[in-house]
Amino acid sequence: MSFKIIGTGSYLPPLTVTNDDLAKTIDTSDEWITQRIGIKSRRISEDESTAEMGYKAAKEALIKSGTAPEELDLIIAASITGDTICPTTAGGIQKLLGATCPAFDINSACSGFVFALDTAAGFFARGTVKKVLVVGSERISKIVDWKDRNTCVIFGDGAGAAVLTEGDGYLDSKISTFGGDDVIKIPSGLNLSPYYKKETELGKIHMAGQETFKFAVSRISEDIKYLCDRAGITPEDIDRIVPHQANERIIDYAAKRLHLPKEKFFVNIESYGNTSAASIAIALAELDHKGGLKKGDKIILTAFGGGLSSASCLIEW
């Protein structure tokens, strides 16, 4: 037994920061950002925590699925920007919902939401859960260097969620980690020990753009081919592909490598930027609520991120 998705939700904070807004504080322009990344604006949290945004996305997903918080058997939250090291983001969402089930976090950067889905699949396979809430929520703005034009223009805040129940909709997956911190790195920025001798780096995002780009294009195309080969289908047979929204040019290159029309890929990076672990969850909810998915559709969710990591899954709607 696996699972099927019965409800999705998303939340974006109200403050919109445009490329022109950023151009007032750093050396950049709307044209530069749009051509290189495909982003026009992003949402930034002014007073909402990671858990609070996750709660709002979760609440919408629960309503869409007709599920009460007390019906949940498990909550998994994917995030790298938790409000505290302890307790967990999932625990904060649980409290806000008034749920009583176990709740824990997964930290796998932008791949986190798909890692969380794959983790949930194991609980369903063992028959220990009937309804699971999976959330991706990020307040990336708090770890961005807003003076670095190569990174601050990319990211945004937000949350997405999905409610899962028993079913046969989760067909296959591929999750990978390529250990190393030289391409995408966020130091903890914390050291109170008088005995630790190494210099402590500030907890802000460091990213090697070209290496990230190459890795992303290769992982998207290879993971999609892998899942299709195992299912005995071709990429052309996939109805929709929901990729991590990191850079529209990555999606363009992956589509060309797979010889697929770009229209098969759902893209919303223009309005929200890269929301890390929330990215695919937000995109899936938007596609769902716009009526872009129908029963029986074969969908691939495909992500890549720090770790380095990648995660893709084949689901039937």
Which residues fall in each region the model found?
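A contiguous, well-structured pocket-lining segment that forms one wall/lid of small-molecule binding clefts
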Residues: 200-269
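Active-site-adjacent elements of ketosynthase-type condensing enzymes
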Residues: 22-24, 81-92, 131-152, 175-196, ...
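Conserved beta-ketoacyl condensing-enzyme motif
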Residues: 5-7, 48-108, 228-252, 257
